[in-house]
A protein has these predicted regions:
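Hydrophobic/aromatic beta-strand elements that line small-molecule binding cavities or substrate pockets
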Residues: 26, 38-40, 58, 81, ...
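Short, conserved beta-strand element in jelly-roll/cupin
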Residues: 39-42, 52-68, 106
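Structural motif
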Residues: 65-67, 74, 90, 100
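Short histidine-centered beta-strand/loop micro-motifs
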Residues: 26-27, 47-53, 70, 94-96, ...
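Ligand-binding loop in jelly-roll beta-barrel domains
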Residues: 31, 87-113
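Short acidic-glycine-tyrosine-enriched beta hairpin
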Residues: 72-88
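A short, N-terminal "cap"/entry segment at the start of jelly-roll beta-barrel domains
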Residues: 1-34, 41, 49, 115-120
């Protein structure tokens, strides 16, 4: 039988300003270990620590612009665009523009603080 997720789990985010993470499926909300799906709302000027995650992360930007820094430079991902970060690849996310950004992140396997491998 299909299972309705009536409301997400709100998770504390890393970064320089408060960012809202709403997990709809994943380790915290639904017990899924193979996938996580979360909506993020980050303010203008938010910067996350760099990371080298052990999971694939597919990010769909719904509003605003998400900058994704990587070893070879940076990508500006705008509303209606998506970016895929592969496991073992260093990335750093930030939202420098007015209004910040809203986006959905899908992680395979599910996001875990133990496998995100943030910069020290």
């Amino acid at each position: 039988m299909p299972r309705l997720i009536e409301a997400p789990a709100v998770i504390e985010a890393a970064g320089t300003k408060p960012k809202r993470i709403e997990e709809y499926a994943g380790r915290v909300k639904s017990g899924h270990e193979t996938v996580s799906v979360a909506r993020m709302k980050s303010p203008e000027g938010w910067v996350e620590p760099g990371q080298t995650p052990a999971f694939e992360e597919i990010t769909l930007v719904l509003a605003g612009m998400l900058r994704v820094e990587h070893a070879g430079g940076a990508l500006e991902v705008h509303a209606g665009q998506a970016v895929i970060a592969t496991p073992g690849e260093w990335v750093r996310y930030n939202t420098p523009e007015p209004g910040g950004a809203e986006y959905v992140a899908v992680c395979l396997p599910a996001f875990s603080p133990d496998t995100v491998h943030r910069d020290a």
